[in-house]
Amino acid sequence: MALTLEELVKRFGGEIAGDAQCKVSGLAPLDQAGPQQLAFLANPKYLSQVETTRAGAVLIAPKDLEKLRAATGGQAAGPLNFIVTPNPYAYFARVAQMFIDLATPPRAPGVHPSATIDPAAQVAASAVIGPHVTVEAGAVIEDGVQLDANVFIGRGTTIGAGSHLYPNASVYHGCKIGPRAIIHAGAVIGSDGFGFAPDFVGDGDARTGSWVKIPQVGGVTIGPDVEIGANTTIDRGAMADTVIDECVKIDNQVQIGHNCRIGAYTVIAGSAGIAGSTTIGRHCMIGGAAGIAGHVTLGDYVIITAKSGVSKSLPKAGIYTSAFPAVDHGEWNRSAALVRNLDKLRERIKALETALAAQGGTDA
């Protein structure tokens, strides 16, 4: 389906520079777009691609359009048509979602014959329940929810209106999923937190006893507009709920321990691990494979770079890193050798300082 720039601006805002009746039917990168496609410029370093793109129109920020016109002496360069908007990247995302929605026929509401719905569950008439879905007693499936094949919803759990759970996602008992959640395939919400009390006597080979499992009687509460990636796991609380606030975005294969609280608009990249009872503030960014210890607090607007380890609270906004970036193998070996010998070097320096002080060559 093709839409004019005028139709896009009526829906999403912005200003048109060029032909308002120019039609686009999809999106593509600047260097690959054709005359029927809309491209976008989010990074000024690619401004030169705007001059050569074949796109029918380009989403561009006002300052970048001014730079383009200055570079071409005010002459037309590249496409004649632009939608001028302060945030071309976000505009692109909204238009892309619209095209996907237009191209995806809505699924008819109803319950697949192979699904198992407990008589004590409440399922809205507008919900779409796919093959082999299980919904236990007391669960509430609100309006417009879509549960794909093999989804499991535990007893007493609520799935908020407009949410979409992809195949094989599981939400254990007693959890609350807010409206418009997106939970991708294989994610597990509400499994037991990692809680065990040591009950051992003696030392060494004479040690006896075992670990005593601590029942995890809390749940998981997830706010509106949260997205959870494939195979991510969010543990239920030991006593109170684990809480994921509104508009949090979590990537694939992330582990969030029991009793954590993740503040609104925070994003967490793939393979990050967050130990139990940790609080992360609003608008934080956690890089891929970062590890955060338990019982620490991160303030609002904290950024943790990829593969960093956080062992203490970071209340102040800022960028924090402890990762060792990749370097040439030989350079890494030399650096490692220096680290191994730091203690010896320290002792040699202390000895030199002592000798110099004894000779009066420097202050002690």
Curated annotation (Swiss-Prot):
One matching Pfam family: Hexapep_2
CDD domains: LbH_LpxD (cd03352)
GO terms assigned for molecular function: N-acyltransferase activity
InterPro entries reported for this sequence: Hexapep, Hexapep_transf_CS, LpxD, Trimer_LpxA-like_sf, UDP_GlcNAc_AcTrfase_non-rep
Protein EC: 2.3.1.191
Active-site residues, record numbering mapped to chain: 258
The reaction(s) this protein catalyses: a UDP-3-O-[(3R)-3-hydroxyacyl]-alpha-D-glucosamine + a (3R)-hydroxyacyl-[ACP] = a UDP-2-N,3-O-bis[(3R)-3-hydroxyacyl]-alpha-D-glucosamine + holo-[ACP] + H(+)
Oligomeric form and interacting partners: Homotrimer.
Family that this chain belongs to: Belongs to the transferase hexapeptide repeat family. LpxD subfamily.
Name this polypeptide is given: UDP-3-O-acylglucosamine N-acyltransferase
Organism per entry: Burkholderia ambifaria (strain ATCC BAA-244 / DSM 16087 / CCUG 44356 / LMG 19182 / AMMD) (Burkholderia cepacia (strain AMMD))
Lineage of source species: Bacteria, Pseudomonadati, Pseudomonadota, Betaproteobacteria, Burkholderiales
